From Swiss-Prot:
GO terms for molecular function: energy transducer activity. It comes from Neisseria gonorrhoeae. GO terms for cellular component: outer membrane-bounded periplasmic space; plasma membrane protein complex. It is a single-pass membrane protein. This is Protein TonB. The keyword Membrane applies. Keywords: Cell inner membrane, Cell membrane, Membrane, Protein transport, Signal-anchor, Transmembrane, Transmembrane helix, Transport.
Length: 283
C-alpha cells in the first residue's frame, strides 16, 4: 500500500509533463510570422502639384495607395488541460478493540456487629442479719432428783455497728447442778451491719443548690434553659468533682451552674453522687 501511494502521484506528474511538451511542439509548428510595420518615407516632386505649365495641381503624379491594415494574428490554440484524477487509496480498517468492562466484584455483606453483652445488674446488698440471741442450752443432772431447783445458763453476744458488712453470732452454754447453782455463759462478738460505699461506687441521691447568679450576657441575649449536674461528694461533704449531665444549650449558663455547685456544701457521711438540676429562667 505504501508503494502504491508513492507511485500514483509520480505517474500523474509524468503524464502532465508529456502533455505540456506535445502542446509546446504544436504551438511552434503553427506559429505564423509576424508582419513588421514601419513608417514609409516617400519623396514627392513639388513640381508635379501644379505650377508654371498650367496643369492642375496633383495631376502629374498618381495618388499613393492606402496602406492595408495588417491581418489579425491567429489566436493561439489553448492546449487541453490535463484532467487530474484523484488518487483513491484504500484505508485499512483500524484494528481497534474496545476495552471490555471488567465485572465489578460483588460486595460482600458486612457482618452485623454483635450486640455487646450488658453486665448483669448487681444484686442489692441485703443488710446482714442481726445476731440472734440463742438461749444457752441447759442441762440438769438427771441423777439429782431431790433438788427442786434447776440451774440455767445463758450467753449473749454483742457487737458494734460500723461501716462495712459482717455477721456476728453469740453463743453461750450453761450447766446447772442439783442445788440450783447458776451456770456460767460466754458470749461471742461479731461485726455490725451497714451499707458500704467508695469513690468508684458511690451512693446515688438527689440534691439541690441555691439558684446561681444569672450571667449578664445571658440576660442580654435572652438565654434560658436547665442544666443537670452530677456532683460527687466525699464523706464529710467536700465536693470532689462536678460534671454536666445535660446541657442547657448555652455554655455561659452551664459554667455558672458548675461554678455554683463546686462552691456549694453537701451533707454526706459516705461517698455520694448527687443529681442536681439547675434552672435558668428570665421572669
Amino acid at each position: 500500500m505504501d508503494k502504491e501511494r508513492i507511485l500514483t502521484p509520480a505517474v500523474v506528474f509524468s503524464v502532465a509533463l508529456l502533455h505540456l511538451a506535445i502542446v509546446a511542439l504544436l504551438w511552434q509548428a503553427h506559429k505564423l510570422p509576424v508582419i513588421e510595420s514601419g513608417n514609409v518615407i516617400e519623396f514627392v516632386d513639388l513640381g508635379d502639384f501644379g505650377g508654371g505649365g498650367g496643369a492642375p495641381e496633383g495631376a502629374g503624379a498618381p495618388a499613393a495607395p492606402e496602406p492595408q491594415p495588417a491581418p489579425d494574428p491567429p489566436k493561439p490554440v489553448e492546449p487541453p488541460k490535463p484532467v487530474l484524477k484523484p488518487a483513491v487509496t484504500k484505508k485499512a480498517d483500524a484494528d481497534i478493540q474496545q476495552p471490555k468492562e471488567k465485572p465489578k466484584p460483588e460486595e460482600k455483606p458486612k457482618p452485623e456487629p454483635e450486640p455487646e453483652a450488658k453486665p448483669a445488674p448487681k444484686p442489692a446488698e441485703k443488710p446482714a442479719e442481726k445476731p440472734s440471741e440463742k438461749p444457752a442450752e441447759h442441762s440438769g443432772n438427771a441423777s439429782a432428783k431431790a433438788g427442786s431447783e434447776q440451774g440455767n445458763g445463758e450467753g449473749k453476744g454483742t457487737g458494734t455497728k460500723g461501716d462495712g458488712t459482717g455477721r456476728g453470732e453469740g453463743s453461750g452454754k450453761g450447766s446447772g447442778g442439783a442445788k440450783g447453782e447458776h451456770g456460767e455463759g460466754a458470749g461471742g462478738s461479731g461485726g455490725g451491719t451497714g451499707v458500704g460505699s467508695s469513690k468508684g461506687n458511690p451512693l446515688r441521691a438527689n440534691g439541690s443548690i441555691p439558684r446561681p447568679a444569672y450571667p449578664a450576657l445571658s440576660m442580654e441575649n435572652d438565654e434560658q434553659g436547665m442544666v443537670v449536674l452530677s456532683v460527687l461528694v466525699s464523706p464529710g461533704g467536700h465536693v470532689e468533682s462536678v460534671k454536666v449531665v445535660k446541657s442547657s444549650g448555652f455554655s455561659r449558663l452551664d459554667n455558672a451552674a458548675r461554678k455554683a455547685a463546686q462552691n456549694g456544701h453537701f451533707q454526706a457521711n459516705a461517698w455520694t453522687e448527687f443529681k442536681v438540676p439547675v434552672k435558668f429562667e428570665l421572669n
